[in-house]
A protein has these predicted regions:
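Conserved alpha-helical substructure of the radical SAM core
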Residues: 1-128, 138-143
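Conserved phosphate-donor/acceptor-positioning beta-strand/loop module used by diverse small-molecule
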Residues: 130-132
Length: 145
C-alpha cells in the first residue's frame, strides 16, 4: 500500500495561518513604482498612488523575515517599477546575499552595462530577466519615454 506524504505546512505568527505551505518558489517585491519607460500597455497610468521608493529599512526587514522563516527559495524584485532605479538597490541585494537569500531581478534592461554586470556578479544575483516587450526598434521607440 502506498502512502502519500504531504509536505509540512509551517505556521507563521499572525499572518498566514496554517493554509500556506512554505517555502514558496519566490516572493515578488516591488522596490519602487518609478520607471524610466512610459509603456502604452502599462497600468501605471491608472495608478493612484504616488511614485516612490520602498524604505531601505523596510525592505531589509522583509528580507530578514523571509530568511528567518525560510519563506521562499528566492526573492524577485520587479512589478510596477524599474528596480535599478532604487537608490539603494545594490545595498538591498547585498543584504539579501548576506542573509543567504537568492535574488532575481526583472528589468527593462536600460541600466545594464558592463559596470552593472560586475556589480551584479559581486552580489550574486541568481537570475536577471530582461523584459523585451517589442519586436523591433521602431516599436521600442514608441514605448520608451
Amino acid at each position: 500500500m502506498l502512502t502519500e506524504v504531504q509536505p509540512a505546512t509551517q505556521k507563521f505568527p499572525g499572518r498566514f495561518g496554517e493554509l500556506v505551505q512554505f517555502p514558496l518558489q519566490r516572493i515578488h517585491i516591488e522596490l519602487t513604482n518609478v520607471c524610466n519607460f512610459d509603456c502604452t500597455f502599462c497600468p501605471k497610468q491608472e495608478m493612484t498612488r504616488h511614485y516612490e521608493y520602498m524604505d531601505f529599512e523596510r525592505v531589509c526587514g522583509i528580507i530578514d523575515e523571509i530568511a528567518e522563516y525560510k519563506m521562499a527559495e528566492k526573492i524577485t524584485f520587479h512589478v510596477m517599477g524599474e528596480p535599478f532605479m532604487h537608490p539603494r538597490f545594490f545595498e538591498i541585494l547585498e543584504h539579501a546575499a548576506e542573509r543567504g537569500v537568492k535574488t532575481g531581478i526583472t528589468t527593462n534592461g536600460t541600466y545594464l552595462d558592463e559596470e552593472m554586470g560586475i556589480k551584479l556578479e559581486k552580489v550574486t544575483a541568481s537570475q536577471v530577466n530582461i523584459s523585451l516587450q517589442t519586436p523591433d526598434e521602431e516599436s521600442f521607440k514608441t514605448r520608451k519615454s
